[in-house]
From Swiss-Prot:
Protein name: Dihydroceramide fatty acyl 2-hydroxylase FAH2
Enzyme Commission no: 1.14.18.7
Gene Ontology terms for molecular function: dihydroceramide fatty acyl 2-hydroxylase activity; iron ion binding
Disruption phenotype: No visible phenotype under normal growth conditions.
Protein species of origin: Arabidopsis thaliana
Membrane topology: Multi-pass membrane protein
Listed GO biological process terms: fatty acid biosynthetic process
Keywords in alphabetical order: Endoplasmic reticulum, Fatty acid biosynthesis, Fatty acid metabolism, Lipid biosynthesis, Lipid metabolism, Membrane, Metal-binding, Oxidoreductase, Transmembrane, Transmembrane helix, Zinc
Catalytic activity: an N-(1,2-saturated acyl)sphinganine + 2 Fe(II)-[cytochrome b5] + O2 + 2 H(+) = an N-[(2'R)-hydroxyacyl]sphinganine + 2 Fe(III)-[cytochrome b5] + H2O
Amino acid sequence: MVAERYTVDLNKPLVFQVGHLGEEYQEWIHQPIVCVEGPRFFESDFWEFLTRTVWWAIPTIWLPVVCYVLSISASKGLTFPQIGLIVAFGVLTWTLLEYTLHRFLFHIQTKSYWANTAHYLLHGCHHKHPQDGLRLVFPPTATAILLVPLWKLLHLLATPATAPAILGGILFGYVMYDITHYYLHHGQPKEPTFKHLKKYHLNHHFRIQDKGYGITSSLWDKVFGTLPGIKAAAKKS
């Protein structure tokens, strides 16, 4: 007897439904629903609230933190040129983190109930509803939690003076990433660089999901061989 395929009811909260899709989950999330109005995730208004973040909350919350940690490095004797170089290193580090997380965590293949559920919350929802403007940037609460182990790791690997500046660079890179990501989905860029980035990223969403993992840059896609080719894109379209 063939098991009946599970059907997600889009009129009900989605999070605890998607796990039932099993092996069909990956196919389902890559059939996007393009609308500005996002779906409901939870029955609870409290948990629903925590999943929604306006884009401008990211620079408002995190840029002051960037300035604060850079001031720590300055107070410990680093010059502004030294801080600038370390921040540049931190930003470069972020671009590699951006690529690595997107490729190996956000696009991990899942099929069990809880793995599908967790993946949907992490990234699957963005591929299913790519224009949901309130679930495009990373929630500040989750970012704050992740910053704790990162801060401790940097203190182990770097000096007391350089660790804050590295964190500032990584955090600044993250802010630029989230703002850029939002703009690529909801902006209408005229400048050639951003027009290219928008086309590059939407190609990842709608044509070749296993290529083009960079958001702010295609650098690491070039380095690691995941740059989508023109011929491949044509075949998928």
